[in-house]
Amino acid sequence: AQLQPVMQEAYRLAYIRKPEFMGNTRTEEKDPKFKVISDLPWSEQEINERLAAYRQLSDKVEQEWHALPAQKKETYFQLVKYPVQAAAQMNNKLLTAQLARHGKADWADSDRAYDSIVSLTKRYNTTKWNRMMDFQPRRLPVFNRVERKALSSGLPEKRQAVYTWNGADCAEGVSAICEGLGYEGKAVAVSKNKELTFEFTAWETDSVEVEVRLLPNHPVEGERLRFTISLDGSATEAVSYETKGRSEEWKENVLCNQAVRRMVLPVARKASHRLIFTALDEGVVLDQIYLYMPRIK
């Protein structure tokens, strides 16, 4: 029971982006730029928040390790300590390197994370699991020590949402909660023609940018995945988010585990508002909805 929240958080963080995707590289592309470690489109704040989450997780795993009797440590190392701490160090290695490229972290910290992965894997490959684990599968660049380089460009700023909801946070509507699925583990499956209602209070401007984040699955019936957004009774046209083949959007969706659609809608000046999400096809899974002040052009 003590380990359940630890493993759930480990899976949640990896759901947002897998450890092997943290270097922003790809294995099947011909363009050489995808063989080189590069920045993720994350702000310094987002990077530090993720590093802190993994640090807290790793510390908890270490505490449990020291409390275990000797006869249980091998099993714990295999099932918990290695997968959680190796993932934490992959994130530490690559995200710290991203900060270091912009002069916001010490390169030595990235190198220490790499050394930690080597040490953890060496420990794994003893006794029962001798020579089973490889910390550099297929010798891909993402598993190497990160090359030191400096960038003159800055990191992006985190855009602040005014309201954020998980699919399960709706005020009204019927849906099936998908426990553990989604960026916060609260995505919902919405049946065809069913609605979810989200409520918010007075808005400061005459328009709102709505960002809808969905599970990037494939169509269940036919070839479409569609929804509409209605704000105070004014509905959008059907919004499609299915992908075709191995398109660039499909690849990006796989890497970040979300399909995203954005729209700007007019907002009347009133004390409260109702935003209604309607699924138009079977297979629609809503992860999150974010509301932003529209960007100034």
What are the roles of these predicted feature ranges?
Residues 1-173, 272:
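Substrate-binding groove of N-acetylhexosamine-processing glycoside hydrolases
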Residues 133-297:
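Extracytoplasmic
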